[in-house]
Design a protein with these regions (language model features):
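Alpha-helical cap/lid subdomain in secreted, periplasmic
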Residues: 16-176
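A short beta-strand-loop structural module common to alpha/beta enzyme folds
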Residues: 1-13
Length: 176
């Protein structure tokens, strides 16, 4: 069991972490991707030469964060980009023959109440069978409802919840 999760990471960070580690995986490994809130995004900061994450709940909101959420952020774009990352991960892991499951903290990813465009529905439908739920809950709601330790501030589920999520996901492969 190896946990590569990082509090506050975006879905783009999750995707880059998978790509950075895909060559080190073998067919006996099980990958669990716990996708985060759809409104967290990365950009490459040329001045600092590193990736930076914008997120609405940040206590350290920069001017860039404020401008981004005021003028550019939209639920439709967030949902599309998140679903694209999930689909890319699905495709890559399948092409490598790696067993995997995906969970999502954010219910908005698969929400269809706002009559999403057909391209959103197509991605949602292609991924729906690969999403692991904990009962009828996503990872975050399950961890919170089961009183797992959470980080201070934004309340990210800590290592114990990630380990239990792995055990839950592992049952999918050992019982099939």
């Amino acid at each position: 069991y190896i946990c590569l999760a990082r509090p506050g990471a975006s879905n783009q960070t999750i995707m880059r972490t998978l790509l950075d580690n895909i060559a080190n995986l073998d067919k006996d490994d099980i990958v669990i991707l716990n996708w985060t809130w759809i409104n967290r995004w990365d950009f490459y900061n040329l001045q600092e030469e590193k990736w930076s994450t914008v997120r609405p709940a940040s206590n350290e909101a920069t001017e860039f964060d404020k401008l981004y959420y005021k003028y550019f952020q939209s639920e439709l774009w967030d949902k599309l980009e998140t679903l694209k990352s999930m689909y890319l991960a699905n495709s890559i892991l399948n092409s490598y023959g790696i067993k995997f499951v995906q969970t999502s903290i954010d219910d908005l990813v698969f929400n269809t109440e706002d009559h999403p465009p057909d391209y959103i529905l197509a991605l949602q439908n292609s991924l729906n069978n690969d999403i692991l739920y904990f009962g009828n809950k996503g990872f975050y709601a399950w961890a919170k409802d089961n009183n797992f330790p959470m980080s201070k501030g934004v309340g990210h589920p800590l290592e114990k919840a990630h380990k239990e999520a792995y055990e839950h996901a592992n049952k999918k492969f050992t019982q099939s």
